[in-house]
Swiss-Prot record:
Residues 38-41, 162-166, 243-248, 276-283 are annotated as: Interaction with substrate tRNA. This is tRNA dimethylallyltransferase. Keywords: ATP-binding, Magnesium, Nucleotide-binding, Transferase, tRNA processing. Its cofactor is Mg(2+). InterPro entries: Dimethylallyltransferase (IPR039657), IPT (IPR018022), P-loop_NTPase (IPR027417). Pfam families: IPPT (PF01715). It comes from Photobacterium profundum (strain SS9). The record marks T104, R126 as: Interaction with substrate tRNA.
């Protein structure tokens, strides 16, 4: 008889839905270790605007995959899958259960379904692309990408050299476009996954939470946090880090494109739009159990019962 696959828990949900609070309570009840699934929490020096767990929360429930990139660096779904699989294996080796918590749905999808077989990076090919960029400019290379792979060309900004370089590198190594290769399915996740999504039943409650959270961020020094990033001089609004909701709007304020009240208003609106996209993803998600943010005890009981009954 084959050995059963190890358990894992996905705790998904829109921003400001109470994922972190529930995850901390779950760690008190179950032998779990937390892995962050959030494309904003990976960045160092971006704590307030991302609502990164604070020292008290991390002391109660340490999170893996926080603060692993500088804001000038990119981080792909493939990078996440590699890192998450390693952390999950380490947690299982310790006799515990991986609890993946966050709202970056693309990361969950990559982890659950696997990724396309993209070629490994080739330093020589990458160096050749860098030389061309220095001679002709990234906009010239972006035009080349649009010709060979219109879908990727439309998705990748000319001022995002890391992603632009990778798309060209993939084509030059494999002879196939990034769009072609990403249609090929990868290896599925070798775990028994219990999937949960937490959100308030009333959308108005979520909107209120988002607005209150943004106000608290401003009070906690969000403007000063973004100003420190702005003054570095090596960051720009086309980087994935600065495109994070809240940061892009505050960046516009610091650049003189709007006043602070307008930046806050835009930030709240952008966060609401993010939550709407996350909920849309989740509504189409298979094998998902919904939890109500307004009934934390029931949510806790639902998850713990599911895990304890699956032995």
């Amino acid at each position: 008889m084959s050995k059963p696959l190890p358990q894992a828990i996905f705790l998904m949900g829109p921003t400001a839905s109470g994922k972190t609070d529930l995850a901390i309570r779950l760690r008190e009840q179950l032998p779990v270790e937390l892995i962050s699934v959030d494309s904003a929490l990976i960045y160092k020096g971006m704590d307030i605007g991302t609502a990164k767990p604070d020292e008290r929360e991390l002391s109660l429930a340490p999170h893996r995959l926080l603060d692993i990139r500088d804001p000038a660096q990119s981080y792909s779904a493939g990078d996440f899958r590699t890192d998450a699989l390693k952390e999950m294996a380490d947690i299982v080796a310790e006799g515990r259960i991986p609890l993946l918590v966050g709202g970056t749905m693309l990361y969950y999808k990559a982890l659950l379904e696997g990724l396309s077989p993209l070629p490994a990076s080739d330093p020589d090919v990458r160096a050749g692309i860098e030389r061309e960029a220095q001679e002709k400019g990234w906009h010239f290379l972006h035009e080349e990408l649009v010709r060979i792979d219109p879908v990727s060309g439309a998705r990748i900004h000319p001022n995002d050299p890391q992603r632009l370089s990778r798309a060209l590198e993939v084509f030059r190594i494999s002879g196939k476009t990034l769009t072609e290769l990403t249609k090929i399915q990868g290896e599925p996740l070798p775990y028994r996954v219990h999937q949960f999504a937490i959100a308030p039943k009333d959308r108005a409650v979520l909107h209120q939470r988002i607005e209150q959270r943004f106000e608290k961020m401003i009070e906690a020094g969000f403007e000063q946090e973004v100003r420190a990033l702005y003054q570095r001089g090596d960051l720009h609004p086309d980087l994935p880090s600065i495109r994070c909701v809240g940061y892009r709007q505050m960046w516009d304020y610091l650049g003189g494109n709007c006043d602070l009240d307008e930046a806050v208003f835009r930030g709240v609106c952008a966060t609401r739009q993010l939550a709407k996209r996350q909920i849309t993803w989740l509504r189409g998600w298979k094998d998902l159990t919904w939890l109500d943010s307004n009934d934390g005890d029931a949510a806790l009981q639902t998850v713990t019962n599911s895990i304890r009954c699956d032995v």
